[in-house]
């Protein structure tokens, strides 16, 4: 069996090297070559013994995901569409800013949560990504951007957010080794504060992540009460808001930051009224023993045809943000980036899936016609 070495964190790679009869320090060397230097050719790895390089050539590989398309926005945002096979594709987005470079990474092909305002959720769920498929997005983005920008080997991506396609905590087994590789000083060397997992609220896995790999946490809240959140985020029927907020408080005991970020997609006439802001204020004040324990990130909705939803007017978003801020809650409004390259997460991948399904339908129709010919 030929093994993709992107599928391992350092401990996993060490175990693999031991199976080959090698010492652990060889895994550390190999890990650095892969993740810090972006090497995919074992012959490039000059400090590895030739005997090990020959072993690896026979049983392993370092393979990124095929890139279907790359779109570069006028504001510098880059979106890649990666082929994960079976007619599925996933997206990763690089967002450059003055003081950081953030990569938004996907964890699943499709998503089973089915949030009403999410383009990915409307596609349905295909499968979980492997650890290697998650890391391959970072590996490709980091090293292709280094070459393009001519950084001389300096790191381009300073922050990773698991906010692409899929619910990360429903792919827990693959997620945690990927996070560990991002944090490892022999890998990407990112701090726990600079890696964020965004979840729609898988309560048991929030608790588990706090013990296994506590990074920064963002929660897709989007509503101040269960009645409103149930149809927007169907997972809320299983883990209602009070259970979710309890889990957030428990997570803070282990988190690298002293706050949870609540993401709140602003939907015209749905969840953007002053009464909704006041309900959020009540939720926040009921917890935290008077201390500041969360912040809100208000997100302008990226419309797509199947949603039946509209973006809240800018003036209403400003008013909503002011109500929260005046109550002492740190509140930001996310800048829209990459509007000219299909900004809504999942739209490009959805186009691929739609074309694949159309081709399959045409193939079935041709088969039926051929069978009917006497």
Curated annotation (Swiss-Prot):
Its cofactor is [4Fe-4S] cluster. Its main location: cytoplasm. Its EC number is 2.1.1.192. The keyword Cytoplasm applies. Keywords: 4Fe-4S, Cytoplasm, Disulfide bond, Iron, Iron-sulfur, Metal-binding, Methyltransferase, rRNA processing, S-adenosyl-L-methionine, Transferase, tRNA processing. It catalyses: adenosine(2503) in 23S rRNA + 2 reduced [2Fe-2S]-[ferredoxin] + 2 S-adenosyl-L-methionine = 2-methyladenosine(2503) in 23S rRNA + 5'-deoxyadenosine + L-methionine + 2 oxidized [2Fe-2S]-[ferredoxin] + S-adenosyl-L-homocysteine; adenosine(37) in tRNA + 2 reduced [2Fe-2S]-[ferredoxin] + 2 S-adenosyl-L-methionine = 2-methyladenosine(37) in tRNA + 5'-deoxyadenosine + L-methionine + 2 oxidized [2Fe-2S]-[ferredoxin] + S-adenosyl-L-homocysteine. GO terms for cellular component: cytoplasm. Binds 1 [4Fe-4S] cluster. The cluster is coordinated with 3 cysteines and an exchangeable S-adenosyl-L-methionine. The keyword DNA repair does not apply. PANTHER family: 23S RRNA METHYLTRANSFERASE, RADICAL SAM CORE DOMAIN-CONTAINING PROTEIN. Belongs to the radical SAM superfamily. RlmN family. Specifically methylates position 2 of adenine 2503 in 23S rRNA and position 2 of adenine 37 in tRNAs. m2A2503 modification seems to play a crucial role in the proofreading step occurring at the peptidyl transferase center and thus would serve to optimize ribosomal fidelity. This is Dual-specificity RNA methyltransferase RlmN. It comes from Delftia acidovorans (strain DSM 14801 / SPH-1).
């Amino acid at each position: 069996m030929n093994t993709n070495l992107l599928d391992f964190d350092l401990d996993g790679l060490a175990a693999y090297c031991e199976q080959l009869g090698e010492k652990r320090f060889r895994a550390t060397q190999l890990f650095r070559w892969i993740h810090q230097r972006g090497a995919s050719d074992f012959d490039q790895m000059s400090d590895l013994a030739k005997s090990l390089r020959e072993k690896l050539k026979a049983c392993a590989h370092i393979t990124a995901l095929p890139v279907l398309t790359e779109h570069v926005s006028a504001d510098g945002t880059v979106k890649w569409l990666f082929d994960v096979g079976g007619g599925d594709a996933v997206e990763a987005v690089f967002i450059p800013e003055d003081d950081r470079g953030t990569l938004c990474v996907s964890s699943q092909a499709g998503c089973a949560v089915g949030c009403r305002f999410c383009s990915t959720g409307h596609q349905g769920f295909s499968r979980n990504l492997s650890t290697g498929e998650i890391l391959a997005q970072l590996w490709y983005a980091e090293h292709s951007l280094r070459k393009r920008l001519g950084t001389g080997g300096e790191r381009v991506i300073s922050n990773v957010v698991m906010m692409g396609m899929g619910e990360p905590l429903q792919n827990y087994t693959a997620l945690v080794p990927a996070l560990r590789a991002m944090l490892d000083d022999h890998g990407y060397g990112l701090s726990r504060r600079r890696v964020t997992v965004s979840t729609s609220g898988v309560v048991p896995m929030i608790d588990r992540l706090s013990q296994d790999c506590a990074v920064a946490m963002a929660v897709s809240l989007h509503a101040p009460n269960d009645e409103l959140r149930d149809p927007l985020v169907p997972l809320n029927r299983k883990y209602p808001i009070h259970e979710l907020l309890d889990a957030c408080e428990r997570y803070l005991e282990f988190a690298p930051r002293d706050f949870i970020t609540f993401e709140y997609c602003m939907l015209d006439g749905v969840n953007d009224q002053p009464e909704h802001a006041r309900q959020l204020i009540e939720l926040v004040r009921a917890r935290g023993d008077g201390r500041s324990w969360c912040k809100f990130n208000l997100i302008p909705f990226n419309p797509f045809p199947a949603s039946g939803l509209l973006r809240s007017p800018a003036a209403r978003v400003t008013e909503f943000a002011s109500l929260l801020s005046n109550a002492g809650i740190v509140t930001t409004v996310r800048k829209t980036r990459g509007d000219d390259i299909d900004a809504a997460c999942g739209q490009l991948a959805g186009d691929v899936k739609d074309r694949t399904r159309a081709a399959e339908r045409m193939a079935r129709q041709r088969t039926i016609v051929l069978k009917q010919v006497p």
